[in-house]
Amino acid sequence: MISGNNTTGISPRQLFLTHLAQTSDFPLALEVERAEGVYLHGPNGERWMDLISGIGVSNVGHRHPRVVEAIKQQLDSYLHLMVYGEYVQSPQVQLAEALAETLAAFETPDGLKLDNVYFTNSGTEAIEGAMKLAKRFTGRTELISCFNAYHGASQGALSLAGAEFFRQNFRPLLPDIRHIRHGKMEELEKITRRTAAVVIEVIQGEAGVRVPTAKYLH
């Protein structure tokens, strides 16, 4: 099969396996031609229900009409401008306001309001930013995460990972990282005045969908 500018006669699947770095030993290698709603469609009439949903990105379904329309409207205005907040961009400002409104009822123990947003490109970047912010704001260095947690693949985020499987090939990692058991009330005593931040999944995913009590999170 020849697709796009491929004139070698090699199938897209083989090109995928040859030229794209694989993130798992056994990739699904499904050739997706298009996606609609909850389904992925292959080039030969195949149809698969997508239970991954872009790891949450496509939870409203693929090519949702409102999402497609919003993207088209933005394309007609401008694409990438600046990531450091130098320009006033209406969609970005509106999203920041909406996020801040969801946190209006919360404040830090010092009485600070959570009304400011820093946008990142990925969850890993968000974790890295949170680690840096916590250290800078508190002046402390200790970070606490949970065993079997997964927070990203960069050096800092990987240091928070609670499974040796993810960390073993990349040591030495960041110092002053401690791990506690997810959902265990007695483990919270390990959070001290040396702790800059506790990084936690509300529901652990990589560990097997572990749901803690509301009391534990509070």
Regions found by a protein language model. Give the residues of each.
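Active-site-adjacent loop/helix segments that line or gate small-molecule/cofactor pockets in enzymes
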Residues: 1-39, 92
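A secondary-structure boundary/capping signal
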Residues: 36, 51-53, 146-147
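Acidic surface patches and DE-rich sequence motifs
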Residues: 42
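Glycine-rich phosphate-binding segment of PLP-dependent enzymes
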Residues: 48, 54-86, 94-118
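Short, small-residue-enriched loops and turns at beta-alpha junctions
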Residues: 57-59, 88, 186-187, 205-210
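PLP-dependent aspartate aminotransferase-fold enzymes
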Residues: 98-200, 204-206
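Catalytic PLP-binding core of fold-type I/II PLP enzymes
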Residues: 210-218
